[in-house]
């Protein structure tokens, strides 16, 4: 299993990138957002990968963070959602947008992804709504693994230091949401209720304290 690639970017296609790792070129399929965040040609890039294995096909899919990769794996666990549909959802909504839409049961947002019809969007929401909180809670821990992801390339110690690896879009948001979700669960709120409150609060709050306060207001008993 290939879980991560670190190499030099040879080129970017419409839906994939070619990464040179020690003289071997790997074709890695990525979402539009991931492709847009990659560095310039010739610079060092690191992607977390998921390998799709079929009888007549081997395909690598790349992600800027382990958190994004986990969401891809969760999405593809839904019947009818292949890697292409998952990439479309993540490319259209981003990780945070997809998490928010699923947690709040917003099938319309999921349907905005190219190739995702209303029935499939509804199935995604229904099947993943209860599973989303667990992945959301992993966000902060997984994103910590992004630190220092670009190591020195073998045999290139004398080369100029590579440009810093681009971070995943909205990484601080996923970290804050994971921390807020964990805090609410520690206060006794159920995973599903806590995740819905955090997802709603994220529309107007960004850092952890703000998210917790806003979520608690949403969870407070209505008079």
Curated annotation (Swiss-Prot):
Superkingdom classification of source: Bacteria
UniProt keyword list: Cytoplasm, DNA damage, DNA recombination, DNA repair, DNA-binding
A GO BP annotation: DNA repair
Region (Disordered): 148-177
MF terms (GO), sorted A to Z: ATP binding; four-way junction DNA binding; four-way junction helicase activity
Main location group: cytoplasm
Listed SUPFAM superfamilies: DNA helicase RuvA subunit, C-terminal domain (SSF46929), Nucleic acid-binding proteins (SSF50249), RuvA domain 2-like (SSF47781)
Region (Domain II): 65-143
Renumbered residue ranges of the record's region Domain III: 172-223
Coiled-coil residue spans: none
Domain notes: Has three domains with a flexible linker between the domains II and III and assumes an 'L' shape. Domain III is highly mobile and contacts RuvB.
HAMAP family reported for this sequence: DNA_HJ_migration_RuvA (MF_00031)
Binding partners and assembly: Homotetramer. Forms an RuvA(8)-RuvB(12)-Holliday junction (HJ) complex. HJ DNA is sandwiched between 2 RuvA tetramers; dsDNA enters through RuvA and exits via RuvB. An RuvB hexamer assembles on each DNA strand where it exits the tetramer. Each RuvB hexamer is contacted by two RuvA subunits (via domain III) on 2 adjacent RuvB subunits; this complex drives branch migration. In the full resolvosome a probable DNA-RuvA(4)-RuvB(12)-RuvC(2) complex forms which resolves the HJ.
Recorded family membership: Belongs to the RuvA family.
Role of this protein: The RuvA-RuvB-RuvC complex processes Holliday junction (HJ) DNA during genetic recombination and DNA repair, while the RuvA-RuvB complex plays an important role in the rescue of blocked DNA replication forks via replication fork reversal (RFR). RuvA specifically binds to HJ cruciform DNA, conferring on it an open structure. The RuvB hexamer acts as an ATP-dependent pump, pulling dsDNA into and through the RuvAB complex. HJ branch migration allows RuvC to scan DNA until it finds its consensus sequence, where it cleaves and resolves the cruciform DNA.
Protein name per Swiss-Prot or TrEMBL: Holliday junction branch migration complex subunit RuvA
Annotated source species: Jannaschia sp. (strain CCS1)
